[in-house]
Amino acid sequence: MQAPPPEHCPGVESEQAGQVSACAGCPNQSICSDPNKKREDPGKALVAAALKDVKHKLLILSGKGGVGKSTVTTLLTRYLARSYPDSNFGVLDIDICGPSQPRLMGALGENVHQSGSGWSPVGIDDNVCLMSIGFLLGSVDDAIIWRGPKKNGMIRQFLSEVDWGNLDLLLLDTPPGTSDEHLSVVSYLKDDSSPDSVHAIIVTTPQEVALLDVRKEINFCKKQQIPIVGVIENMSGFQCGHCGHSSEIFPAKTGGAAAMCAEMEVPLLGSLPLDPAIAKACDAGEDITSVKNPTTEALEGICSKIMSSFN
């Protein structure tokens, strides 16, 4: 049996495993530093066992913060759950320092309960459940000031110790960029024997400052050999509710997501407008996907493409 890793452990799969100062005195140092021994995190087997009844895993990524990735995750989940009532969906919020899903899903103040089979995720609807570190905080204003290894440990717990049950799709709301959290979740979910073990959707806005970082996110997925279902362009335009005039709040100076997707050879799933009603509903934790409007019309096509990609 291996001992628990030290606080600043670089990770057993890291090239620095067993070689940095944090490794000094660790009982596992000789194991990690031996190039002849396979460096595979023992937690990976626990994750695989815990998620054996989860058919598909979908990372929701964004290169830039503020593009509405968490809002898009919520909208996708709610629309999918409404459109496929016989399927079960889960949401895992792994934005450890900025958990948004409890508010967006209308679950603020809910508690996570421990059972014999692990943590029980919070039920949102009959076929939707949610897990977030936001449920474990004493107050919504509590700051989480953790280094990478502690975040990674929390992600491993969420993946291996939550009783997700039978899910058709688990959506993972990630922080922006390509940080420790992304490397950690990919290492746990990726199965080399099954290339389709985890997929990704990337969220952007039309302006070049967001697209620059999305290109990096696409390259990250390609290097990690994660199939990209497609890109969603959020806040693509605003239609006045009074006169019907459309305005580009974030002008696409370089062609927007469509041009970038053509350049990077990835699918464009669709575009979502900037809608004040959606923002208001998300702040209140309300489901607005049953109301027919430009956003839900766009979601219909996007969600159909997502589900088709798994068949």
From Swiss-Prot:
[4Fe-4S] cluster 1 binds at residues 9, 23, 26, 32. It is found in: Cytoplasm. One of its GO terms (biological process) is iron-sulfur cluster assembly. Heterotetramer of 2 Nubp1 and 2 Nubp2 chains. The keyword Iron applies. This is Cytosolic Fe-S cluster assembly factor Nubp1 homolog. It comes from Drosophila pseudoobscura pseudoobscura (Fruit fly). ATP binds at residues 63-70. It holds the Pfam family ParA. Keywords: 4Fe-4S, ATP-binding, Cytoplasm, Iron, Iron-sulfur, Metal-binding, Nucleotide-binding. It comes from the Eukaryota. [4Fe-4S] cluster 2 binds at residues 240, 243. CDD domains: Mrp_NBP35 (cd02037). InterPro entries: Mrp/NBP35_ATP-bd, NUBP1/Nbp35, P-loop_NTPase, YlxH/NBP35. Binds 4 [4Fe-4S] clusters per heterotetramer. Contains two stable clusters in the N-termini of Nubp1 and two labile, bridging clusters between subunits of the Nubp1-Nubp2 heterotetramer. GO terms for cellular component: cytosol. GO terms for molecular function: 4 iron, 4 sulfur cluster binding; ATP binding; ATP-dependent FeS chaperone activity; iron-sulfur cluster binding; metal ion binding. Belongs to the Mrp/NBP35 ATP-binding proteins family. NUBP1/NBP35 subfamily. Its cofactor is [4Fe-4S] cluster. Component of the cytosolic iron-sulfur (Fe/S) protein assembly (CIA) machinery. Required for maturation of extramitochondrial Fe-S proteins. The Nubp1-Nubp2 heterotetramer forms a Fe-S scaffold complex, mediating the de novo assembly of an Fe-S cluster and its transfer to target apoproteins. Its main location: cytoplasm.
